[in-house]
Amino acid sequence: MVPRDRVNAAAAGGGGEGRLVQSGIVNKKCDKKAPKRIHKSEREKLKRDKQNDLFNELGNLLEPDRQNNGKACVLGETTRILKDLLSQVESLRKENSSLKNESHYVALERNELHDDNSMLRTEILELQNELRTRMEGNPVWSHVNTRPALRVPYPTTGVFPVQHLPHLPVTTTAAFPQQLPVIIEQHYAATPRELQLFPESATSEDSEPSQEHGISDHVTRPQPRYPTPTATLPVNLFPVFPGRQDQQCSSGTSGTNEEDRIGRS
């Protein structure tokens, strides 16, 4: 066993070394210079100077040309500007929410339009296929579709051929939707030839122009010619009754007899 004396000696030796270490640390702290204590009034003065500098900078940022640069004016102006900015922020938030809703609605409408376009395209393709099948099944359809469209020119004149009645003037008028001028075409009946009841008078008439070429001393009296009413008027214009037919014949013979007498005189 270790004797008590040695243990006590070791403990005494260890305590001496600890004291030496602590004494060395204390000496190092004492070597540094202690800072000067700042007075409370000086600290307050530094704070006020710093605040004044900050207020001056804020006043210059708000209104550089302002005459009154007091702290109260600067604080009031800053609070007013902050309120305006906050109100603008709120209005912008509301506008942003409304724009988001509108954009969502527009996106839905766009999708609906895309769906409608796709449906219309499918319907068009179905109709084209159906038309193609009908054209292939029915040759008449293909002939009609392949045949070029005939262009009917509009007539330059407004007169159409009309079957004319005998011995009657015919007027034809035609008016188109384009308000073409009305053209009237009149066809006059040919003058009826006189009945040659006396061939001798006809030969004498033929001989008169031949005598005009030469000078003749004998002057003949001209013979008047009066055409009968039946000769000038067309036969089919007025109906002839059987009772009046004899009267017309008798009047015609009497008229010819009078002409004969006048010619002989």
Swiss-Prot record:
Domain bHLH residue range list: 35-85
Entry's Gene Ontology cellular component terms: nucleus
Region (Helix-loop-helix motif) location: 49-85
Predominant cellular place of this UniProt entry's protein: nucleus
Stretches the record annotates as Basic motif: 35-48
One Pfam family from the record: bHLH_IRO3
Superkingdom in the source lineage: Eukaryota
Keyword Nucleus attributed: yes
InterPro entries the UniProt entry points to: bHLH_dom, HLH_DNA-bd_sf
Keyword Transcription on entry: yes
Keyword terms, alphabetized: Coiled coil, DNA-binding, Nucleus, Stress response, Transcription, Transcription regulation
GO molecular function, one term: DNA binding
Coiled coil, from the record: 75-130
SUPFAM superfamilies assigned: HLH, helix-loop-helix DNA-binding domain (SSF47459)
Compositional bias segments (type: Polar residues): 245-256
Sequence segments annotated as region (Disordered): 1-26, 200-265
Start-end of Basic and acidic residues biased regions: 210-220
Family: Belongs to the bHLH protein family.
Function noted in UniProt: Transcription factor that plays a positive role in salt stress tolerance. Interacts with TIFY11A/JAZ9 and binds to the promoter of some potassium ion transporter genes to regulate potassium homeostasis during salt stress.
Subunit structure: Interacts with TIFY11A/JAZ9.
Protein name: Transcription factor BHLH062
Species for this entry: Oryza sativa subsp. japonica (Rice)
